[in-house]
Amino acid sequence: MQEHLIVSLDGKDYLVEPGTNLLQFIKSQDTFVPSICYNESLGPIQTCDTCTVEIDGKMERACSTTIDRPMIVNTQNDKVQASQKEALDRILEKHMLYCTVCDYNNGDCEIHNTMDQWGLEHQTYEYKEKPYEKDYGPFYRYDPNQCILCGRCVEVCQDVQVNETLTIDWERQQPRVIWDNDTSINDSSCVGCGQCATVCPCNAMLEVNMEGNAGYMTDLEPGSLAAMIDLTKKAEPGYGPLFAVSDSEAAMREERIEKTKTVCTYCGVGCSFDVWTKNREVLKVQPQHESPANKISSCVKGKFGWDYVDSDERLTKPLVRKNGQFEEVEWEEALSVVAENFNKVKGTHGSDGLAFISSSKATNEESYLMQKLARQVIGTNNVDNCSRYCQAPATKGLFRTVGHGGDSGSIEDLEIADMVVLIGTNTAEAHPVIASRIKRGHKLYNNTLNVFDIRKHEMAERADNFYQPKPGTDLVWLSAVTKYIIDEDLHDKAFINEWVNHFDEYYKSLAPYTMEFAEETTGISKDALIDFAHQVADAKSVSIAWAMGVTQQDIGSDTSTAISNLLLATGNYRKPGSGAYPLRGHNNVQGCSDMGSMPDQFPGYQKVTDDEIRAKFEREYGETLPKQVGKDNHQMMEGIHNGEIDSLYLYGEDTGIVDSNINFVQAALEKVGFLVVQDEFFTFTATYADVVLPASPSLEKTGTFTNTERRIQRLFQALEPKGDSKPDWQIIQAVAKAMGYDWNYTHPSQIMDEIARLTPLYSGVNYDRLEGYNSLQWPVAEDGTDEPILYLEGFNFEDKKANFYPLTFDNFFKVNEEYDLHVNNGRLLEHFHEGNMTYKVPGLEYKVPNAFVEVSPELAEDRGIHEGAEIKLISETGEVELVAHVTDRVKGKEIYIPLNNNAMAHGDHGAINLLTNSDVDKDTDTPSYKRTSCRMEVKTRRGKSPLNPTNFRVNKQRQPQYSVRVQDKWKREDYTFPGSQVDR
């Protein structure tokens, strides 16, 4: 194959790699060619025809041309200019230029910029208004009269987000973008990701927060705005002066609209984007092509879920309980109360009488300081974080087998994998951008998708194969498949011989896991499992992703271990598109654990029981540190009940709602002698507090998050803290100072420098290396070299070999006659966990106003209930009252309750954890949230559906297709390729 080809561009020769896109090459040479429909994140769409150039004497679109031979390319001759002028005129026939009073006059309008740069002064064709009104959804709106039919929105919806809602109806006399089978935005299958607005080159698709808000004259009434547009156009003899005026107005906007790079504060994907703010209002969230985890992708929460930041419900002053009532106080008094009571408890109960719960919503720097406060200032290892509730078992399984507690590759590996296996993860709703990558690989590249889950969610519906095992039995089918692969000599012997220990011992341990035992135990047929085993063995690369459906079981650690065993047996580590992907639930649950907010580990998973490691931290901290392992979250609650713990300091976590068996937890919160809650809002847990400290959300601070793929990214402060609230790092430092320890940090970068000194995983991390959209995936060497794919140089053990880990199974879960229903639970796309943030976003609350319970059609028939029935669910630990949604997403006696209910603080009774019990994973103390059974009492047999009828889950009809179907445009009688027109 040739290394380079000669391309003559406007008379100058260049050496170009074969396969290079011609338009990108032209742009790389600083040669201007208009390209309004082209977006580097989307690739060629071929709808606008503006990028036409002459190639070897023939007029062709540059965007869809691959350099596969020597070429002579001309971008400047008369024919090219005439063709481009014709294409630009056709665009202005569809789009009225009124830039100065346009909401999108922000310097990014590609129509404005293209016309200006091309030098177009007058349009040939008069603008034609279309017979369509604007269409508004809760988050964005569509203006057909400004739409140029470039198709970017369709491309991103169909082939990037892969929600498959948008199409262009090319059959109409005047084509337009349509939703589903031609319904409104609000009544469609649209999930509100907003990517259509992200990629729109003009003001046709626009965030509703931008409309009337962005410019100096954009808030005019429609009639006045129309008059202003007419006046402006009549006053200017050509577009040049008009553009000059609008450019001046755009520059004025830049003075009052701040654009700040940040990282999303919701799930663990780690989407980064620019957030546009005016005063304290978030106008727009704009992902960038260089965003490392998400590119241009977003979900409804990341794109539109920011209203909570300026909510009137934000805490803005410290609160201290006095005579049973909370009173606002100044920081000095609040900190004095905290220090006095910490010292008091330490004096009466010792250092281990205090406990600390860190937040997976906070930054790495803040999580680091929380464990430092516990260990250096107080002298206890009683510190933990919410990874205990979800991800600790996955980390345990990976530490056992491969040595690092994190994803073995990157998100992009899930897109390029030959096969993706999803186990116990509702990825489309819990990790939407990752789901989009998987859906894209499945749709465009024909990658195989296998889903194992007890619930038929979207990914299950899309899968090539969907398997529904009995609850809690994943370890069995995983081990049976691994055994079958080895029995049939399908395992990767060369990989095992070179890279894995303990094969013989492990193979012997698989003896009980016959296909017959697996079929009987899991309910999946032997034939289906054998077929799956062959698929795994034959695939070039396999990636397995899992989440809380696996980890929140009595044997979550063992099942996670079984996943890694299967990957090792088939050689699916150490190469692109392969490996283990425990999908982290929170924006920084990975980082919070990395930072040592755990009872047994310092930052970087360095054990507190290791004398050498502990001595290193003692030298840094100047104190003797405890060597005994502390209490985890679960043990803290027990410690309060039995009198061992009398003070608890937690931040960024609503423990009284999110922990399992919350009747038990709430009793502990009531009993503990001194409780400090640090949060953005007065949470349910705060009702038990003695002191409440007002904290700042991510937009009001600087720091770093580490996402599910071990990617460390900086977030930059976009807003000043509201009222007297403070970033968590400042509050924790102030608590330490009140206790007599002056840390003297003036910026989070200093904290990261300290982390890097002490933590080999982060040794090369500093803020300079994370400037802008730069990121690093740990482990990071001192020179800044990171590892997007783990284990290329060997596994994280002394001998560089992984370990097979034998497992046993005797954990049969069965409901009994009294509690005959199995309760599953998890996230909804629109809300994040209990909803403390998302219920303060009107559009999200509108789409899903309350939690509910999914009931199967067969169970509904058996109990004589219908949509909207009010039912009471009763378990051994508590009861809830919910409204039923009847759906085939669940089957039989499986029911599903979303997590999104924080309403107990308002007197409601829908929180899932009133039903869950205190059972835990035997190795990590992670609550067995998924191992819950209950019985049902019917209060009313039918009623109003708990879902808004506009919700995408309610009988919506997606319209899958590939790209924008531009060929249908080309077939229209009124279409002629401009290049052909000038060739005549």
Curated annotation (Swiss-Prot):
Entry keywords, A to Z: 2Fe-2S, 4Fe-4S, Iron, Iron-sulfur, Metal-binding, Molybdenum, NAD, Oxidoreductase, Repeat
Needed co-factor(s): [2Fe-2S] cluster; [4Fe-4S] cluster; Mo-bis(molybdopterin guanine dinucleotide)
UniProt: [4Fe-4S] cluster 3 binding residues: C157, C190, C193, C196
Span list, region Formate dehydrogenase: 252-984
Sites where the protein binds [2Fe-2S] cluster: C37, C48, C51, C63
Enzyme category, top tier: oxidoreductase
4Fe-4S Mo/W bis-MGD-type domain: residues covered: 257-313
Cofactor comment: Binds 1 [2Fe-2S] cluster. Binds 4 [4Fe-4S] clusters.
Biased composition (Polar residues): 947-964
E.C. numbers: 1.17.1.9
Domain 2Fe-2S ferredoxin-type: 3-79
Record-listed [4Fe-4S] cluster 2 binding positions: C147, C150, C153, C200
Binding site residues for [4Fe-4S] cluster 4: C264, C267, C271, C299
Residue positions binding [4Fe-4S] cluster 1: H95, C99, C102, C109
Family listed: In the C-terminal section; belongs to the prokaryotic molybdopterin-containing oxidoreductase family.
Protein name in the entry: Putative formate dehydrogenase SSP0601
Record lineage: Bacteria, Bacillati, Bacillota, Bacilli, Bacillales
